[in-house]
């Protein structure tokens, strides 16, 4: 007679790092969130290429293969390596935060955890979209995890994209303070929200209202005295420096 050993099999391979396992605990979800932070510090984002674009555009960089010529002459193409990798780098952050937020929302974690981790992820998504709008204007807007059907999307008007940025940042205002200097906090959210409002003023979007909004946010941060200038400017550039009282994020 045939024997069945189905009862001996693991139906849920708990050693496998799938979404169900990762988002079953605060520590697992936090590791996934730190992965989103890591993509923002990658070579194709703040780790190198995003920083190189304004430097190259100002004429302060040099490439043996004339790699910066297009940017310096303000005639860069989408095929330029620095341009394409920066675009892809920011959308990688967006893709990962979209997936993170969907899995976090579907998890059984506490409302407090969802608010904290979700707020941090939304800040990262907002930052990525702000950078994209600053460089390219109208860009595709995606707030859900990527699927094969959604790979190719038309550009979304920058006004709508910035509206999503403001919404994400407002959602992030309620996050708690953290002792980790590399993590976002509510004061950094307010500072950046003020910057976004002022960007909208410069673009002619609800000028009077957004000018007041920007001032309110900047005043709140300034009056709290959370940040201040370094007494010695050179201290910002030492190879031992990992953070600074000037650093907002």
Protein language model regions, located:
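Bacterial Sec-type N-terminal signal peptides, specifically the leucine/valine-rich hydrophobic h-region
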Residues: 2-5, 129
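Acidic, glycine-rich segments characteristic of secretory precursors and extracytoplasmic regions
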Residues: 4-54, 89, 99, 159, ...
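Aromatic-residue-lined binding/catalytic grooves and analogous aromatic/hydrophobic interfacial grooves
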Residues: 8-13, 45-74, 98-102, 134-140, ...
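Short linear capping/connector segments at secondary-structure termini
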Residues: 17-19, 75-78, 143-150
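Conserved beta-strand positions that form and line the central face of beta-propeller blades
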Residues: 22, 140, 152
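Intrinsically disordered, low-complexity boundary segments flanking structured domains
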Residues: 23-26, 127-128, 232-240
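Conserved, well-structured interaction surfaces
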Residues: 30, 34, 38-40, 66-136, ...
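Short, mixed-charge aromatic SLiMs
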Residues: 148-157, 220-228
């Amino acid at each position: 007679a045939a024997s069945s050993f189905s009862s001996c099999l693991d139906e849920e391979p708990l050693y496998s790092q799938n979404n169900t396992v990762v988002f079953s605990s605060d520590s697992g979800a936090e590791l996934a969130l730190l992965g989103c932070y890591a993509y923002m510090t990658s070579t194709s984002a703040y780790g190198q290429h995003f920083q190189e674009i304004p430097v190259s555009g100002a004429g302060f960089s040099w490439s043996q293969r004339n790699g910066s010529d297009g940017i310096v002459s303000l005639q860069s193409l989408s095929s330029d390596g620095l341009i394409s990798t920066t675009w892809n780098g920011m959308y990688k952050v967006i893709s990962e935060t979209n997936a993170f937020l969907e899995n976090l929302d579907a998890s059984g974690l506490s409302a407090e955890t969802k608010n904290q981790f979700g707020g941090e992820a939304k800040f990262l998504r907002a930052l990525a979209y702000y950078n994209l709008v600053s460089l390219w204007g109208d860009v595709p807007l995606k707030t859900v995890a990527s699927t094969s059907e959604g790979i190719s999307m038309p550009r979304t008007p920058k006004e709508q994209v910035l509206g999503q940025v403001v919404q994400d940042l407002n959602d992030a205002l309620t996050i708690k303070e953290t002792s980790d200097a590399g993590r976002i906090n509510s004061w950094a959210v307010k500072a950046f929200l003020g910057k976004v409002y002022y960007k909208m003023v410069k673009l002619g979007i609800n000028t009077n209202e957004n000018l007041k909004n920007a001032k309110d946010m900047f005043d709140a941060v300034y009056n709290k005295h959370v940040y201040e200038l370094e007494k010695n400017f050179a201290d910002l550039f030492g190879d031992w420096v990992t953070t600074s009282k000037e650093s907002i994020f």
